[in-house]
């Protein structure tokens, strides 16, 4: 451990203010603190509150973690007061203003880092915070990028950036094409790779992210080498070996309270949820959660609900706590849906204790938006996936889960949900399509049995990776040794 030989290392962590980014960064903070690293997490007051309980327990247990709050620049950026997290925005169409607001934190954060003691040895910053590039350079502190994505997606994005001219020759957004120089033959449409072809202000922001990636000292990835060995190997070549795969970071949550409150306090009583699951047969329940920023239109959500009903299988459906989904809740109540499914359907409005649910023996499938955290948590729990990607890296994650890992079934979504244009897209999978996909995942066919066996094996590999001597545990050691070596010439 680093602290056994010299004053402990001090890492400053900058999570991006979206649940899918903050949750693994807080896990990383605890993993590093467990190895003797002093940790400072920099975030805004509203976001600090979401992790208050989890971090308080960590600090009380003796982990050297400090939480420093900086004011979110609402007024200066033209953002509404109180919207300090991506999941609080009234519309995802306003997300660019939110992303760009963080550049206004550069001056106060640089001042903070100049004054903080002990002097930081390393910055770990989310890829969506390119303003930290300049701070790290000005202060001479090595900066490591945290990518909340898998190496499959990172390699794919890197290759397609290099083949930009090839992409421009493809006229249709619906035409499938193979990724060149990829370990496996995988095909996408242009609309499924939204971070590659952008224009205007979004391009400027993404160019800043790319520059930050290219100039960083290295990259931390929430994956494990045994899950995607060819993609970890090839992405390491791209980054000259400075890649540390340290996942699944969610497995640092060993206490029931930490699992239940990971990311936010759950909006359902933990005991009530477990009691409901205990009443169901092993492997019979489908868990349905489309992430913290699900942007499906009402028409599609209705079809999803009706398909779940017609599947005749028990399910837990997590419904996003956005104000816009009040219409969905009205439909659930007024159409008689809630009454019809009350014996075998559990509805959770808001935040769910996802880790507790996925690890329960009654859960036999996970209908997911394919955010990387959820994809990895499902696999880590040994639960087969029903994939419903929405945007961003999620189509890449679907390809990895279904085509490469053989750990899931596609719902049949072909088109990305463009932020601010969701209503134009409408219904992509009708209730019959939902019912059919659920049956394929949860049924007793030979393919379904083989899939369950395969994902269980992957889950076992995930747990071994984070144990002492495992690949991810060792990679944390290698990371700390690397940063310590950088400090030696300064002695």
Swiss-Prot record:
Keywords: Detoxification, Glycosyltransferase, Transferase
Family to which this protein belongs: Belongs to the UDP-glycosyltransferase family.
Binding residue positions for UDP-alpha-D-glucose: 292, 352-354, 369-377, 391-394
Protein encoded by which gene: UGT73C1
Biological role: Involved in the O-glucosylation of trans-zeatin and dihydrozeatin. Also active in vitro on cis-zeatin, dihydrozeatin-9-N-Glc, and olomoucine. Can detoxify the explosive 2,4,6-trinitrotoluene in plant by forming O- or C-glucose conjugates.
Alphabetical list of InterPro entries matching this protein: UDP_glucos_trans, UDP_glycos_trans_CS
Inducing stimuli: Not induced by cytokinin treatment.
Top-level class of the enzyme under EC nomenclature: transferase
Species for this entry: Arabidopsis thaliana (Mouse-ear cress)
Coiled coil residues, start to end: none
Keyword Nuclease: no
The protein, known as: UDP-glycosyltransferase 73C1
Pfam families: UDPGT
EC numbers, comma separated: 2.4.1.-
GO molecular function: cis-zeatin O-beta-D-glucosyltransferase activity; trans-zeatin O-beta-D-glucosyltransferase activity; UDP-glucosyltransferase activity
One GO-annotated biological process of the protein: response to toxic substance
